[in-house]
């Protein structure tokens, strides 16, 4: 046995062990110190003196207030520009056409996000040490009134975006895709945004059930000059839930669609290259709209329109990695998480993974933390970026 070649872990694991040594512990120590100050020192019988009497901070994972990853709750949203990333919930499911429950998506995602630490092993990223993150709570949506809710959503997202904080939206059904992009476009001036849309459904109908529902966001978003249809990339489309009315719009507007078969046959890297090239052609930034049902239904049962045959989690996460690291990302939303239909929080956990990976890739690619507002953010709001809706 002494002559045997010593075991060496694969290169990624070996690199991960080294990366961890380069990370500071400043944020962790600040959290401990604050916890002991605000939460009182522990009882005398507790040997680990970093533990307070009242839970403050990451540990224990089953306790505490459910903000996203236990990030600070920002009561005064006027101060959001002081943070690198702002998490905002949009508890709206009045746009659903089948199974409701996505109004509870933000709660479900926040609750299971407590399971995560801020550190990712493979990437060697510690979000607590490398960015400032806050949770601004939820936008006040209006039940049973999509248009009033859309107005609220656009105003809220425009506020966060214009502040310079990176907005991450917890949906909510996919009808919110239109007002979130509208909020972004209000502060783009003459700049343009490409949209990369992960989904099993095209979501390009003009109306559904006589309203702008979760099947309709991209028809209306791509009506705006700041969000051209030629820069809309749709990844994972397919199956038995793609209305022909929406297909007609995709054909007429020449959106860029890849099915799951396209992606697997051309390779993940080729699919990522395609998405990046089309979304960035003549645009200044990229918006990512991640519908959780793009993942195969066996992995994400807690959604409004589950469809078998979707992407595997590792496939979607790899595409996300390539796209975020190689484009100028201005924000993202994760939609269609419906906790009432979930099993063991697995859908909410998948959404959490998408969000945490996104933040880590932004750090690795140098997009976060920000030292100044991106040049594509225009200070003055253009409230007329979209056509009036009657």
Swiss-Prot record:
Instruction: Give the UniProt record's GO annotations in the biological process aspect.
Output: putrescine biosynthetic process from arginine, via agmatine
GO cellular component labels: cytoplasm
The protein's GO terms of the molecular function aspect are: agmatinase activity; metal ion binding
Q: What is this protein called?
A: Guanidine hydrolase
What's one Pfam family here? Arginase
Q: Does the keyword Metal-binding apply?
A: yes
What does the record say mutating residue 97 to A does?
Loss of activity
Q: How does activity depend on temperature?
A: Optimum temperature is 55-65 degrees Celsius. Is highly resistant to thermal inactivation.
Keyword tags: Cytoplasm, Hydrolase, Metal-binding, Nickel
Record comment: activity regulation: Activation of GdmH depends on the presence of the accessory proteins GhaA (Sll1078) and GhaB (Sll1079), which load nickel into the active site. Hydrolase activity is slightly activated in the presence of GTP. It does not require ATP or NAD(P)H. Addition of Ca(2+), Mn(2+), Fe(2+) or Fe(3+) has no consistent effects, whereas addition of Co(2+), Cu(2+) or Zn(2+) inhibits the activity.
Q: How does it assemble?
A: Homohexamer.
Which reactions appear under catalytic activity for this entry?
Answer: guanidine + H2O = urea + NH4(+)
Effects seen without this gene: Knockout of the gene does not have any apparent physiological effects on the cells under normal growth conditions or under nitrate-deprived conditions. Nevertheless, under nitrate-deprived guanidine-supplemented culture conditions, the cell growth of the mutant is severely inhibited compared to the wild-type strain. The guanidine-degradation capability is abolished. Mutant exhibits arginase activity, as determined in cell extracts, identical to that found in the wild-type strain. The mutant shows about 69% of the agmatinase activity found in the wild type.
Free-text remark on how the cofactor is bound: Binds 2 nickel ions per subunit.
The cross-references to InterPro entries, in alphabetical order and at most eight, read:
Agmatinase-rel, Ureohydrolase, Ureohydrolase_dom_sf, Ureohydrolase_Mn_BS
Its annotated compartments are: Cytoplasm
The EC designation for this entry is: 3.5.3.-
Task: Report the pH profile.
Answer: Optimum pH is 9.5-10.
Record's family? Belongs to the arginase family.
